[in-house]
Amino acid sequence: MHHVNKYFNQTMVIEALKMSFYKLNPKQLIKNPIMFVVEVGMVLTLILICFPDIFGTSYLSRGYLITIFIILLITILFANFSEAFAEGRGKAQADSLRQAQSNLTARLIEENGAYRIVNATELKAGQNIRVENGETIPADGVVINGLATVDESAITGESAPVIKESGGDFDGVIGGTLVTSDWLEIRVESEAGTSFLDKMIALVEGAERNKTPNEIALFTLLTTLTIIFLVVIVTLYPIASYLHLILPIAMLIALTVCLIPTTIGGLLSAIGIAGMDRVTQFNVLAKSGRAVEVCGDVDVMILDKTGTITYGNRIASEFLPVNQQMLEKLIVAAYMSSIYDDTPEGKSIVRLAKQMYINELPKDIDGTYKPFTAETRMSGIITNEISVFKGAPNSMINLVKQQQGNIPLNIESLCMDVSSKGGTPLIVIENNVMLGVIYLKDVIKDGLVERFTELRKMGIETVMCTGDNALTAATIAKEAGVDRFVAECKPEDKIKVIKDEQAKGHIVAMTGDGTNDAPALAQANIGLAMNSGTISAKEAANLIDLDSNPTKLIEVVKIGKQLLMTRGALTTFSLANDVAKYFAILPALMMSTIPEMTSLNIMHLSSPKSAIISALIFNALIIVALIPIAMKGVKVKGYSIDRIFINNMLIYGLGGLIVPFLGIKLIDMIVQFFV
């Protein structure tokens, strides 16, 4: 979805602030052990405010303790806000989607052709409805009659209306979208609770998102580091006593909060939620957060040619007769074989024939139409006088041979010429006589070459699977820029391709929409099923594209990469922060008792009290500063993995070491006048 910015509004910020206070509940906060430690420290500080000498005599004033308490509270609120804000984006999206389907009625077409107005929630799959200009489509469905423009901006964010008509790839409509011209008759495909909008709303408001294995592993590491720092602080107290250094409990609490990885601890949940939301904004349903995360590890992508690499609607561009005298006969025969063919290819053949034939072609032909099937790989019409068919070269040659017909000497070279150009050849026969070849042109989708180049730099190999012959496949693969191809590939062959790649240790992603794709979708590490596909395909996949656009697999994989890189970059920054804060604060605390520590106080912090307050303020502010990065993710450019690693180490590793020194010093220059 492309209308993300409108969710960054005042209402959402206010709701996130409210949720920040609600999440102060220890039952909520204990899910994040790092921030729970901060809350425990905050409670202990509150006790010290009420009873300053409960843990022994302290030289810290009540005002100083209140300052520490407030900063700790703000730190927790900032961390809660980042998570609530990420959740709020999804909820705002759900509210927007819910408005699109509220209070809708439908014009139901009765069996006698009459219309009856009903509530949209009463519609059943299989019923037919009529929607006219200015009306909202009440349910998901397929156009069976009419042609109109439809505004889908409420769903996709795209302002330009799209044309919907029966047949082809543009016959699916989504409930909640607006008809902006003419009228449509639609066969309902979904019932109340199962529509596109319902699925989107269920995703963003559904069950609690479980942590992914990588997230759990990182949480375990961060929790371990927190425990280690707690042990360090606990042992620091007796060491300080031995050195006759007075370290009040409140100062030790503040030091603990500064040293444990609060930055990434406060942002980790938000990073995962924001990653899921970014996938949702592309109208992709992820069955789990793990599916999105695995996308980041994908290094092999299995892509269908038709619909993914090419537009899917192959267009008739030329008639190639076996000899020039046969051209008119070829045009008429191609037209006759396609007049009842509702596929985009068939319609394009009819259009081309009308353009090229100077005489008028018949509008209706009395005969029996034979549709294309996967078994016959041909289609055509049989009348009392003639039979005309078009189809795949192998099928047509075999048919002519079975009926003892003649195979023109140049028919194979004509087919080879078409294949060498990346097109698909269809042979046309009339009464078992080969007339020539129809050149169906495959059109490569715009921008794919650049995207495949970017994926290659990121270490992802692309493999094109196609039913075309090797020559056609090689031409398309070269033009599109994919790394490898598998020609004459049947759906069941994809499983072998996937298993072979997995046996080499690769993480494989693929797309599919049919029942025959289901085993391969289940076998792949990431399976992206089309919403227009079969139920079995959608059940086998772990991602569902509600727009039924196979090319989205590329975007989803990039989002997965971005999620992992964002988590890694901010973890690096957080840990580098902790190291920097350790060397910034400890010398300032110890220099009064251990003069040798003065040389390590490179920032010349004013006093232990100002050093602690400055570090606490910086600790809270850095969480807020990093929220936009957690929400949007770090930029994933078309660099190699090594280049990205080096960039992140320079920006977030080295930056994580330098920024605390500068930040704490600047804050200390102000704080020293108040403590």
Curated annotation (Swiss-Prot):
Residue numbers binding ATP: D341, E345, F372, T373, A374, E375, T376, R377, M378, S379, K390
GO molecular function, a single term: ATP binding
Residues bound to Mg(2+): D513, D517
Catalytic residue list: D304
Record-level GO cellular component terms: plasma membrane
Recorded superkingdom: Bacteria
Enzyme superclass (EC): translocase
Keywords tagged on the record: ATP-binding, Cell membrane, Ion transport, Magnesium, Membrane, Metal-binding, Nucleotide-binding, Phosphoprotein, Potassium, Potassium transport, Translocase, Transmembrane, Transmembrane helix, Transport
Catalyzed chemical reaction(s): K(+)(out) + ATP + H2O = K(+)(in) + ADP + phosphate + H(+)
Membrane topology: Multi-pass membrane protein
EC number, UniProt record: 7.2.2.6
Transmembrane segments: 34-54, 65-85, 216-236, 245-265, 569-591, 611-631, 644-664
Compartments where found: Cell membrane
Oligomer status and interactors: The system is composed of three essential subunits: KdpA, KdpB and KdpC.
Annotated function: Part of the high-affinity ATP-driven potassium transport (or Kdp) system, which catalyzes the hydrolysis of ATP coupled with the electrogenic transport of potassium into the cytoplasm. This subunit is responsible for energy coupling to the transport system and for the release of the potassium ions to the cytoplasm.
Family, similarity comment: Belongs to the cation transport ATPase (P-type) (TC 3.A.3) family. Type IA subfamily.
Xref: NCBIfam families: ATPase_P-type, kdpB
HAMAP family reported for this sequence: KdpB
Name under which the protein is recorded: Potassium-transporting ATPase ATP-binding subunit 2
Organism field: Staphylococcus aureus (strain Mu50 / ATCC 700699)
Gene designation per UniProt: kdpB2
